[in-house]
A protein has these predicted regions:
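Predominantly the structural core of cysteine protease catalytic domains
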Residues: 117-198, 202-205, 241-244
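Positively charged n-region of N-terminal signal peptides that target proteins for export
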Residues: 1-6
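Active-site-adjacent structural segments surrounding the nucleophilic cysteine of cysteine proteases
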Residues: 7-129, 174-176, 181-184, 189-192, ...
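Sec-exported extracytoplasmic/periplasmic mature domains
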Residues: 83-95, 104-108, 135-143, 163, ...
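Noncatalytic regulatory segments and standalone regulatory/sensor domains
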Residues: 37, 178, 182-193, 202-249
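Short coil/turn linker and secondary-structure boundary residues
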Residues: 94, 125, 153, 221-225
Length: 249
């Protein structure tokens, strides 16, 4: 092999090595770019999957109470309207229509169920029934809050609960007068009254009890009456009330 041939072979080898180097460099560069881009894509996917948590204890739900009006669709739906107003104060988006299917219904048991039809002029229940209804609404959503029947507590206990920033659903009267009892009873102990009405109490201050009334269209349904007057009517209605608690997870 002469020298010229050797030089040509050497040139070809150098050219091949150079070309191979370019190819390897290009592959390496692409790989580096892919590695730089990939984490950004992963981060974006992770951010999209992070849930937004709304269900957490609120500092002062009583301050969030707004009346939910029951008319004209639900003439006797004050219990459901009060429940919607109450739950909304805790950050939920409840409507009367959402709660009606969650209620138990009965022809005579207004302690654990609802008698009648909220879309008519005849329909009523007591605190235990509404607690069941609201928890039937809350449990399937895996919420942290549950409602509890606190009927029978003293007035001081009631005031302390309200003053802690927690609202309460109470059984009152629709005309703000004493209850007018009927002959409708359950277990020969519980007696229904014809002017029964549910409201949501959210404040007691300077001798005035403030509550949201689903039948009052003035002042966005917010009403205030003297504490001694409210207490007398509430106790005559059986001191019925509903509060809440947060479950441990």
């Amino acid at each position: 092999m002469n020298r010229k041939t050797k030089d040509l072979i050497l040139i070809y080898i150098c050219f091949a090595l150079f070309a191979a180097g370019l190819i390897i460099w290009g592959i390496t560069l692409k790989s580096c770019k892919d590695q730089m881009i990939q984490p950004q894509e992963v981060v974006q996917e992770q951010q999209a999957e992070v849930p937004v948590v709304y269900d957490r204890p609120m500092a002062n739900p009583a301050a969030q109470v707004e009346a939910v009006q029951q008319l004209p669709e639900f003439p006797s739906g004050d219990e459901f309207a009060a429940a919607a107003s109450f739950l909304n104060a805790y950050g939920y988006d409840a409507m009367i229509e959402d709660l009606i299917p969650c209620m138990n219904y009965s022809e005579d048991n207004f302690i654990e169920a609802y008698i009648g039809d909220a879309t008519t002029d005849t329909g009523y229940c007591f605190a235990g029934s509404l607690v069941i209804c609201m928890n039937n609404y809350l449990v399937p959503q895996n919420t942290a809050i549950r409602t509890v029947n606190k009927s029978g507590i003293s007035w001081e206990e009631f005031k302390n609960y309200i003053n802690s920033g927690q609202p309460m659903i109470v059984w009152f009267t629709n005309d703000y007068n004493s209850p007018r009892f009927t002959d409708i009873t359950y277990n020969n102990y519980f007696t229904m009254y014809e002017n029964a009405h549910c409201v949501v109490v959210y404040g007691i201050e300077n001798g005035i009890v403030a509550f949201a009334d689903s039948l009052n269209e003035n002042n966005s349904g917010k009403v205030g009456i003297p504490e001694d007057e409210f207490r007398q009517i509430w106790e005559a209605c059986g001191s019925q009330c509903i509060g809440t608690y947060y479950i441990n997870r």
